[in-house]
């Protein structure tokens, strides 16, 4: 069992994790997110993604997970050294106490406790340079998506790509987030339609071995329902249900924004009937107009109905809500929690379960950009909501608490975070610069999307209007130009300095096959030409140069 009966997360950490080291996290061995579309990987959603070696996977397909970088991080964790890329957890743990006065529980505990004690002992005693098969895997086939959420970017959303291609890169952003919004992230889509993708090829080569031990396969995106490969996986489960030794034991999960048309939602519900253990993940953190503003593309009333349709008509073992806590969602986060409570009362405590994920990048959208009086207001509202839940102590029809202990612990962590932590991450710009970027970003966001910040967040208007920003005398020239104002063969090229500063210059590309790297050139004339569609960090952060990945 992952944890003993009635064992708290802190008790588990003391019993299992601490004896290994002060920085151990099983996710570095047993969990991965892999962006097959362009060849990026990470062991959880907090560190920046890093590149998969395209040459190494030719002889070792498991290197789409077992990269040299991860093996280095594993060695550090076994030695008790804190990898800098895992700073999210170190910030939580260094708070010393949560809002209940307990030792804070970071995500490395949550991401370790899901595995058996035997698995933990096995990886903790193996050579960190050895390859290991995953237990939980999240993959994305491409970035096709019908949403363009404010905290997302073109690397993950084709709708974001359309925004930047139509209007050009976002102007006048000065902090660490600039690299997210200055171009259409061409590296995230490096292969033409009929070109073989070596990362997808490696995945399928590893699959016969991997599928025997894998406990959960989770598909993310983009929006998975818009990719044919996802429906192919549903067919795999249907065809192998009775012949594959692990098909009925493996959880198959899909991360969906559930913003599809009714026909697509019905197709998903029908496809789930052929999966023995199907789990559905969706995202949300705010209600109504605010939720629609943050998650552009969302229609709040339709999304709620789609959640209900999936729970009533789908074969759903687990329904999970991923909350990305940002500066804007706190204005209605309590109402969103109330909506989830209502769902739990109707469908059971686990439908949905929720996770509270604190946004750090882009840092100007972090909750820590807010002024002290708003942070204190939201801190109080969340504390009162949680106190009410504890006082009522509601159970579902099976006697399970509507809000699980670990859900409460994540909320107490957020409550304390709003009170104690001052910067989203160690390379964050100063507060004035974050406020500047907050204002200039959302002014452009409104103009491009036909939205209205002031209507969506009336309690933030006074502060928002007080934010000072420097207007540009003329448009910046080092970012991607709007459609119609640039030559087809001219694109933005991103460079990241050792300090994490992003600079971009436009470069002229020769006509060549999409995805061709400069190592493949056969013409010395172009030997020094920047590589256009180059695989890179999935979110525009280079773990070797931004100070977050390694020593």
Regions found by a protein language model. Give the residues of each.
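Short, intrinsically disordered, charge-biased short linear motifs at domain edges
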Residues: 9-14, 66-79, 133-140
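Local cysteine-cluster metal-coordination motifs and their immediate loop/turn environment
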Residues: 83-94, 144-154
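Core AdoMet radical
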Residues: 134-144, 155-198, 211-230, 240-264, ...
